[in-house]
């Protein structure tokens, strides 16, 4: 039984996309896919089909704005000169994350299954592992607190012993 409810904040989107975050996400993904040189005549259909599939799953699961928040956060951190690594974990199997410059692994090239990251039958939110340098992680906390309010976020930590 879930003892908590996750509230994904509504993001300020360009007016043209205010009522359709998924269309905004798709535009960003397509623009970046073209920028990465992925939409060549030989593989355009394969990449567009995978992009549309992933975005449809994000939309069905209600995670489009969550993903847009992750994109905004990583972009802000990158612009501020902070180092981060986002290639660990199953979300590296997402072409959307690759197109949005969050990961550097082309899941089609390496035949990675998106459904390992997210599928409509999954009960839990997807686990997005992003590692920040030690000094930067506090800047990330500060950014998120300022953006969404201290009362709207929580910190989770796992301790391991040997």
Region annotations inferred by a language model:
Residues 1-162:
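Phosphodiester-processing cores and adjacent nucleic acid-binding clamps
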């Amino acid at each position: 039984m879930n003892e908590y409810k996750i509230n994904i904040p509504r993001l300020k989107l360009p007016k043209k996309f205010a009522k359709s975050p998924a269309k905004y996400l798709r535009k960003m993904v397509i623009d970046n896919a073209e920028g990465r040189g992925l939409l060549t005549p030989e593989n355009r259909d394969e990449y567009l089909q995978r992009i549309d599939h992933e975005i449809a799953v994000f939309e069905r699961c209600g995670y489009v704005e969550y993903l847009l928040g992750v994109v905004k956060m990583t972009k802000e951190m990158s612009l501020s000169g902070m180092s981060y690594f986002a290639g660990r974990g199953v979300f590296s199997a997402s072409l959307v994350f690759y197109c949005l410059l969050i990961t550097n692994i082309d899941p089609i090239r390496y035949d990675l299954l998106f459904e390992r990251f997210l599928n409509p039958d999954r009960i839990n939110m997807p686990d997005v592992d992003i590692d920040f340098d030690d000094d930067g992680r506090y800047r990330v906390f500060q950014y998120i607190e300022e953006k969404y309010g201290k009362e709207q976020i929580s910190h989770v930590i796992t301790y391991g012993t040997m």
